[in-house]
Design a protein with these regions (language model features):
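C-terminal alpha-helical "lid/dimerization" subdomain adjacent to the S-adenosyl-L-methionine
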Residues: 24, 169-228, 234
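Hydrophobic beta-strand segment of the Class I
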Residues: 37, 137-138
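N-terminal auxiliary segments of SAM/dcSAM-dependent transferases
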Residues: 2-28
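A short glycine-rich, Lys/Arg-flanked "PGG" loop and its adjoining helix->strand segment in the class I
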Residues: 150-162
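A short acidic, Gly/Pro-enriched loop at the edge of an enzyme's catalytic core
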Residues: 125-136
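Conserved alpha-helix/loop element of class I SAM-dependent methyltransferases that forms part
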Residues: 36-39, 46-66, 81
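Core SAM-dependent methyltransferase catalytic element
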Residues: 229-258
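Class I SAM-dependent methyltransferase SAM/SAH-binding core
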Residues: 67-126
Length: 258
């Protein structure tokens, strides 16, 4: 069923905005798509987003605090999947968009997970947690929406225990020419039209396409993780490389990986 749309909004390209403008734009965009966010994620990815999250959670190791920090949690899908696979853990979900947090809380209440998952408002670039308090810090499809990615990576590294993991799941614009042409057509032509049938702010999905196309290639992002102080950095292509799973480890205080 189509929804009533608001007046068509336009957003500047990611590469042409300041960090402050980027943060404000992200809050505005995601505040307008919360009610249909889960449906559109599943629909537009042909439900591959569910499989990708499962793959990310399978790589998580909980050995000390038994706690996961889900950064840019959105409506909490990564947090919920983590609890499904690791019933012994507790999850803290953090997001900068109040409307997303509200939807996330409703979801976990319906699933009777309020005692296992908590949500709070917060900025990934200034995490409100002490050092060394989570086994894993993860973020699914959110790192590209953060203006200062190196700072967010440093913060995620800071709050995990020595030997803990930073796990990133993010979309990728393929480099293979033929696949790139098809994906460009999908992102810039097909996706906005499909989203427009269901979203009251279809322009948000133009931003989605733009943010994917301007995200660093896997080799560059993996290097960014190393520069943030993470070790044993891995990058794994999923579904022909349209999504990548990145894993990094916080070294111990002697600089060694546990």
């Amino acid at each position: 069923m189509a929804v009533k749309k608001q007046k068509m909004q336009k957003y500047r390209q990611v590469s042409k905005v300041t960090s402050t403008e980027h943060s404000r734009m992200v809050r505005e965009i995601f505040a307008t798509i919360t009610e249909r966010y889960d449906f559109l994620n599943h629909f537009l990815s042909l439900r591959r987003d569910i499989v990708w999250r499962r793959s990310a959670v399978r790589e998580m190791h909980f050995f000390q605090s038994k706690r996961l920090l889900d950064v840019a949690t959105g409506t909490g899908d990564l947090a919920i999947e983590a609890i499904r696979q690791h019933p012994e853990i507790q999850v803290m979900g953090l997001d900068i968009v109040p409307e997303m947090v509200t939807i996330g809380r409703r979801k976990i209440e319906k699933k009777h997970l309020s005692g296992r998952i908590r949500f709070m408002l917060g900025d990934a670039m200034i995490l409100p947690f002490p050092d060394d308090c989570f086994d894993v810090a993860g973020i699914a499809f959110g790192i590209r929406n953060i203006p200062d990615r190196p700072q967010a990576l440093r913060e995620m590294k800071r709050v995990v225990v020595p030997g803990g993991q930073v796990i990133i799941l993010e979309m990728n614009f393929p480099r293979h020419r033929l696949f790139r042409l098809f994906y460009d057509l999908y992102l810039n032509r097909i996706l906005p039209v499909m989203a427009g049938a269901f979203s009251r702010n279809p322009a948000a999905y133009h931003y989605l396409a733009d943010s994917i196309m301007h995200f660093p290639p896997p080799v560059e992002f993996a290097a960014m993780m190393r520069e943030a102080g993470l070790t044993a950095v891995e990058k794994h292509p999923l579904t022909l490389g349209i999504t990548y799973l990145y894993i990094g480890v916080k070294p111990d205080r002697n600089g060694l990986q546990k």
